[in-house]
């Protein structure tokens, strides 16, 4: 049975609360998922019930257009997350799940994790991970990340179509930097705390994203559209997509930044049951 926002929202709220905080002790088996994003690297741990119990997040420019351009930086962050989690739980993770943008080489993410000392227990593309987490049927998933937007169509629990477009939060930052006449780094920081203020300037970028999504889902006969990714947290996004797709039920849970990391960690729990930190 498909999960809904009432099922998902408390898990995302828990993840947001735990982010870079010291978690409570637990005796549960633990599964790790690592999300290598364009703007951030997130390592999330879930327990036997699929509940988030720890989240490490670093804002980092290590991935661009689905390619790890700063390999050493990415490996260093993942190792630091592993050290932090070992200190917190008293156990070292040896396996982790990860993901990749549709249409790119999964070895890119796998190589980072292996170089950090991990064995990859499961790997899948980002929108498929979200679709699996939510157990969707007859729905579309749009994962707007930092550098790319992943799109997947799910029918009867199976992904029947997926694509990746080179547009995302990085392009929003570029637009904002030009509008404000500030550096790209300043724009990245500014947009996180001034969402409503910057909406008029960045709205055209999201309109373009919605047009791209419309092209990919045309004729697919879906009834629901789920939005994921940190770039969806911009105020105004949900309303824009609902106006663009009035015939669809558009879902945008709070704290969508953590949807893909939760989906990745959960996929490891489901697909690699025996591979966990004990």
Swiss-Prot record:
<keyword id="KW-0143">Chaperone</keyword>
<comment type="similarity">
    <text>Belongs to the EutJ family.</text>
</comment>
<dbReference type="GO" id="GO:0046336">
    <property type="term" value="P:ethanolamine catabolic process"/>
</dbReference>
<dbReference type="InterPro" id="IPR013366">
    <property type="entry name" value="EutJ"/>
</dbReference>
<protein>
    <recommendedName>
        <fullName>Ethanolamine utilization protein EutJ</fullName>
    </recommendedName>
</protein>
<comment type="pathway">
    <text>Amine and polyamine degradation; ethanolamine degradation.</text>
</comment>
<dbReference type="InterPro" id="IPR050696">
    <property type="entry name" value="FtsA/MreB"/>
</dbReference>
<dbReference type="Pfam" id="PF14450">
    <property type="entry name" value="FtsA"/>
</dbReference>
<dbReference type="InterPro" id="IPR043129">
    <property type="entry name" value="ATPase_NBD"/>
</dbReference>
<comment type="function">
    <text>May protect ethanolamine ammonia-lyase (EAL, eutB-eutC) from inhibition, may function in assembling the bacterial microcompartment and/or in refolding EAL, suggesting it may have chaperone activity.</text>
</comment>
